[in-house]
Amino acid sequence: MAKLYFYYSTMNAGKSTTLLQSSYNYQERDMNTLVYTAAIDDRFGVGKVTSRIGISQEAQLFHKESDLFVEIAQHLQQQPLHCILVDEAQFLTKTQVYQLSEVVDKLKIPVLCYGLRTDFQAELFEGSKYLLAWADQLEELKTICYCGRKANFVLRLNDKGEVVRDGAQIQIGGNDSYLSVCRLHYKEKIAL
């Protein structure tokens, strides 16, 4: 039975690596996958899911205007699809999360979404909010704070390494712009 999955975490927990491994597992069994990533995330090149450990795969791009149900249905007419994988799922819109639930419910294709739960101000991203609400299965991917505790928050750092408290929710940057930390160190650094 197809399901909508949401694998969420903070930065540097291996979301893209896990996505790429899942896609490979399907392909190794001669099953077709369709991989998506956000058009606004071009850190490692446009139309590519890339892991920090160096593996990558070409991907379809989604924009705020993309109708994912229609796109996936069109791909399905060209070849059978066994799994849809979405990287940077925090950038999905509410409507796109609904469209992915329709892929699961009407097209009977499992959809695996990978993304951040919250931003640097500990606020939910739109895509994450609706995936947390509508996914059939939620799984947290874990990483650790510099103190060794589980990291579940992310700090945004400026070019001097100072913590940024205000600003736009979405700022595409590499690992040097963000730091995953535990709640204790998040509160200390943000000074709420």
Swiss-Prot record:
Protein's organism: Pasteurella multocida (strain Pm70)
Protein's UniProt name: Thymidine kinase
Similarity comment: Belongs to the thymidine kinase family.
Gene Ontology BP annotations: DNA biosynthetic process; thymidine metabolic process
Compartments reported by the entry: Cytoplasm
HAMAP family: Thymidine_kinase
Membrane-crossing segments per the record: none
EC class of the enzyme, as a word: transferase
GO MF, one example: ATP binding
Record key words, sorted: ATP-binding, Cytoplasm, DNA synthesis, Kinase, Metal-binding, Nucleotide-binding, Transferase, Zinc
Taxonomic path: Bacteria, Pseudomonadati, Pseudomonadota, Gammaproteobacteria, Pasteurellales
List of residues binding Zn(2+): 145, 147, 182, 185
